[in-house]
From Swiss-Prot:
Keywords: Cytoplasm, Protein biosynthesis. SUPFAM superfamilies: Ribosome recycling factor, RRF (SSF55194). It comes from the Bacteria. It is found in: Cytoplasm. One of its GO terms (molecular function) is ribosomal large subunit binding. Signal peptide: none annotated. Responsible for the release of ribosomes from messenger RNA at the termination of protein biosynthesis. May increase the efficiency of translation by recycling ribosomes from one round of translation to another. GO terms for cellular component: cytoplasm. It holds the Pfam family RRF. InterPro entries: Ribosome_recyc_fac, Ribosome_recyc_fac_dom, RRF_sf. This is Ribosome-recycling factor. One of its GO terms (biological process) is translational termination. The keyword Cytoplasm applies.
C-alpha cells in the first residue's frame, strides 16, 4: 500500500495541473488557443472540444483562426463560442472563424489578476487540505501502533516540506500569470 505522503504528492501534483489548466483559460494580452480547449460543440449529439473539430492557428498576437475539418461545423462552432462568453465575437466568413481579441483595458487586467489570485488561493487551500489528510492518516497509523512517535514527527515534517514545495510552485505560477496579464 502506498504511503500517505506518496498519495498526498500525487494529489498535490494534480492540484498544480488543474491550476495550470485554469490559468491557460484566462486571457492575457495575446490570443491563446487554449482558451478554446473547454468550449464544447455539439458534434452528432456528443459534446466535443473545438480543438478536436478544427485546426486552430494564431496568425497574429491578438487573432485566432479556427478552420473546421467539416464545413457544416462552422455554424455550430460559432454558436458554441458565442455561448462560452469569451469576451470576443466570432467573425465567420464561410470558410473560417476569426476571433479578434481587443486590447485589454487597465480595469479588465485588474479584474483578471483578481480572478487568477482567487484560482491560486483555491489551489493553496486544496494543497493545505491534502497536507491535513496525510498528517491525519499518519496520526491514525500512530494510534494503531503501526508507526512510532518519532516516525510520526518525521512524517509530519516531510509532509510539511512537500506542502511548502507545492505552495511555492503556486506562488511562481501566480507571479508569472500576473506579469503576463499586466504586460501591455
Amino acid at each position: 500500500m502506498p504511503e500517505p505522503i506518496q498519495i498526498a504528492e500525487e494529489k498535490m501534483k494534480k492540484a498544480i495541473e488543474t491550476l495550470k489548466e485554469e490559468f491557460a483559460t484566462v486571457r492575457a494580452g495575446r490570443a491563446n488557443p487554449h482558451i478554446l480547449d473547454k468550449v464544447m460543440v455539439d458534434y452528432y449529439g456528443v459534446p466535443t472540444p473545438i480543438p478536436q473539430l478544427a485546426s486552430i492557428t494564431v496568425p497574429e498576437a491578438r487573432m485566432i483562426v479556427i478552420q473546421p475539418w467539416e464545413a457544416r461545423m462552422l455554424k455550430e462552432i460559432e454558436k458554441a463560442i458565442q455561448k462560452a462568453d469569451l469576451g470576443v465575437n466570432p467573425a465567420n466568413d464561410g470558410k473560417v472563424i476569426r476571433l479578434i481579441f481587443p486590447e485589454l483595458t487597465e480595469e479588465r487586467r485588474k479584474e483578471l489578476v483578481k480572478q487568477v489570485k482567487k484560482m491560486a488561493e483555491d489551489a493553496k487551500v486544496a494543497i493545505r487540505n491534502i497536507r491535513r489528510e496525510a498528517i491525519d492518516e499518519y496520526k491514525k497509523m500512530k494510534k494503531n501502533n503501526e508507526i512510532t512517535e518519532d516516525d510520526l514527527k518525521d512524517a509530519e515534517e516531510d509532509v510539511q516540506k512537500l506542502h511548502d514545495k507545492y505552495i511555492e510552485q503556486i506562488e511562481k505560477l501566480l507571479s508569472a500569470k500576473e506579469k503576463e496579464i499586466m504586460e501591455v
